[in-house]
Amino acid sequence: MAIQKKHGKGRLDKWYKLAKEKGYRARAAFKLIQLNKKYGFLEKSKVALDLCAAPGSWCQVCAETMPTNSIIIGVDLAPIKPIPKVITFQSDITTEKCRATIRSHLKTWKADVVLHDGAPNVGTAWVQDSYNQAELALHSLKLATEFLIEGGTFVTKVFRSKDYNSLLWVCNQLFAKVEATKPPSSRNVSAEIFVVCRGFKAPKRIDPKLLDPRSVFEDVAGPAPNNEAKVYNPEVKKRKREGYEEGDYTQFKEISASEFINTVDPIAILGQYNKLSFEQPKNGDVALAALDKLPETTEEIRLCCADLKVLGRKEFKLLLKWRLKVREIFGFPSKKTQKAAVDEEVAVVENMDEELRIQEELQRIKEKETSKKKRERRRENEKKQKEIVRMQMNMTAPMDIGVEQEGPRGEGAMFRLKTIDQNAALNKIAKGKMAVIKETEKPKDYDFGSDGETDESDEEADRLEEELDNLYDQYRERKAAADAKYRAKKARKENGDDEWEGVSGDEEKGSDDDDDEELEVDSSDDDSDSEDGESGKKLITDLDGQPEEKDGLSKRAKNFFSQGIFAEIPGLLEEPESEEEEAQEAELVEAVEDLKVTKKEKKEAKETKAKSKKAAEESDDDDDFEVVKNNEDDDWENVEKKKKNGRPDIDIITAEAMTLAHQLATGEKTSYDVIDDGYTKHAFKDRDGLPDWFLDDESKHDKPHKPITKAAAQAIKEKLRAYNARPIKKVAEAKARKKFKQAQRLEKLKKKADMLAGDDGMSEKEKAASISKLMASVAKKTRRAPIKVVKAAGSNKGLQGRPKGVKGRYKMVDPRMKKELRAMKRISKKK
């Protein structure tokens, strides 16, 4: 296996090798050396503070370059190995503990240079990484303002992003000179740049918002477009190529002329859109048709609306005047009519509407309830505060603490029946294993040979069977709550794909009964109907004894809606049905039954029509094309896709289906054989009266196993392998991008060729030569220049920078590298 050579971040990096040769802990040391060579700030400094210093290469450079007896402090989250003449400690630069440690080391000194070469953990979205880096640089700047001497230097690393300008603006407020540079040792593929800030102003007071990331990097909304300048001064307007608008990537914008008449801001439409259209939409527009037929809509107006971008100030004024005239004709309110209406409204006082009165009443009730809750909360807090004060003053024993005695629901919550009865607590108590079993007077006989009277009166067996069904239903509910596939299967069983043919009278009656069904453990089948109405009994009984009505309204809600303001609202309270409504309901049921009969007749007519049509097509062999009529009788809910020959498009995905299809195709089986195979001992099994748990378990084993062939299984495997062999999304997108770029190049080439072909100053020979030259330039593949190998010997030994006489890409080689490559090959062979 060939060894992959690494470029950029690999071992062959020049600065990496130089760092190893000179004993630096990281290649980043050369970045500081080159920055100091350009600006010269380390030689004059006596105190240096290195933030995010690990592994300590910048501290090494400071110790070598700065004068003797200088104070160098390095801090980082990661531990730093000891460095001579350098004080290092481990801390977070955003905490107060780090500031205190730095103060203890500096004492009364101030730092001449503050360095920051840190970066957060990257790997998420680029926007998040760049923001984290800018935020870290701002924190280091905040720390530098506390310890930097007046006229000092601050060097930090930042990423090129949208937050870069904001950070640079903050640096300009605090320093005299701010420059951004990129040293040669920084990789070209990296987005990092270094900002060197010199001449610290040392202000006496700094606004906290100036060093707050939330304020500095806050997104500022762009200025609103000046549409008035586009309309009233189109000649002076300067185009600013700022790209597309957010969410709108179309260059040509068109709007209906009727919308221009109806809008309240016509200048914005004239400044943003390209055309006012008079074309009718598909569904039709009455206002646009009337606008098109008005005599005020002259030919000049139509020409001006055709292209708004070429109009001048005069034409825009003409369109605005035309709009005012049309609005006056259509009866839209103008400025004069609005002023008159305002004067009249001042004089006339209208009565409050019924709807507004209801809304105000509801708002008042809501505010009253909110204030009541606030008062209760305040009293509870005051009570807790008093108890705490009593405890602190040793006025009570710990066992008498009121807060713990009362519990989370307050004092006496255990004996509040209203709280207990919430969320159908009574039904939960009476359900499941906690149900009360009624005592029987006489033991029951479970022998199968007993007489008929004892079998019919066997209430205990019925109760046990009902309890078993109840427990099985609870087990299924728990299983459904844990398994998503089970829930989906259950939903498919309940909601079939049958055709909906309306609601009959019997179904309407049964739907209400199904919603109210509940499992009663301590009741039999005979008295279950009588106890259905009593299942809603509560622990608290009203003294007035009025039963709750079926409309779902409580007594309090009913009293509220019985006020006079709700009397005139139709349909709010239930009214008894009249005889006419009952007759209409009976007619509706009859119509649904008739509809079912007519649908069956239509279906039979369709089959006969299809047979006759097929016979006619077979007889007519001279036609070259097939005429397919639109079948208006197709059901819109039939989502099954059909082919042109009328057969359903079925995807074969199992080996059993593939075996059956192969047998039908080869003639081993006919359709009648398949129908005969369906008549088995499992086809007409009597399932009435069997419990659900037995049917669910039996359904796993009562299905016949159909044989499959080896060829069918192999065909299904090949089909799945073809599905899996499809390219991934990234590969498909890359191919699509490549194809799109090729289409763009061909489009540009076509335009250039058309321009050359239409040039009258060139002969046909010159045109052909130019077009062939263009084609050759497109087909020509650009080859990268080969990398030149330069031996690090003689004059090139220990050379820093590009060797003399070498252009383009190159790499330095030496005997040491050759030995390392041989050793790597030898090690890889052993593995």
UniProtKB/Swiss-Prot annotation:
Annotated signal peptide: none
Subunit structure and binding partners: Component of the nucleolar and nucleoplasmic pre-60S ribosomal particle.
Gene designation per UniProt: spb1
Subcellular location: Nucleus, Nucleolus
Phylogenetic placement of the source organism: Eukaryota, Fungi, Dikarya, Ascomycota, Pezizomycotina
One GO cellular component term noted in the UniProt record for this chain: preribosome, large subunit precursor
Protein name: AdoMet-dependent rRNA methyltransferase spb1
Gene Ontology MF term list: rRNA (guanine) methyltransferase activity; rRNA (guanosine-2'-O-)-methyltransferase activity; rRNA (uridine-2'-O-)-methyltransferase activity
Entry similarity comment: Belongs to the class I-like SAM-binding methyltransferase superfamily. RNA methyltransferase RlmE family. SPB1 subfamily.
Keywords recorded for this protein, A-Z: Coiled coil, Methyltransferase, Nucleus, Ribosome biogenesis, rRNA processing, S-adenosyl-L-methionine, Transferase
Swiss-Prot/TrEMBL catalytic activity: a ribonucleotide in rRNA + S-adenosyl-L-methionine = a 2'-O-methylribonucleotide in rRNA + S-adenosyl-L-homocysteine + H(+)
EC number: 2.1.1.-
Residues of the active site: K157 (proton acceptor)
InterPro entries per the UniProt record, alphabetical: RNA_methyltr_RlmE, RNA_MeTrfase_FtsJ_dom, rRNA-MeTfrase_E, rRNA_MeTfrase_SPB1-like_C, rRNA_MeTfrase_Spb1_DUF3381, SAM-dependent_MTases_sf, SPB1-like
GO biological process per UniProt: maturation of 5.8S rRNA from tricistronic rRNA transcript (SSU-rRNA, 5.8S rRNA, LSU-rRNA); maturation of LSU-rRNA from tricistronic rRNA transcript (SSU-rRNA, 5.8S rRNA, LSU-rRNA); rRNA methylation
Sequence ranges of Basic and acidic residues compositional bias: 474-486, 534-554, 593-617
PANTHER family: PRE-RRNA 2'-O-RIBOSE RNA METHYLTRANSFERASE FTSJ3, RIBOSOMAL RNA METHYLTRANSFERASE
Region of interest: Disordered: 442-556, 569-644, 790-816
Ranges of Acidic residues composition bias in the record: 448-470, 496-533, 574-592
Coiled coil regions in record: 349-396
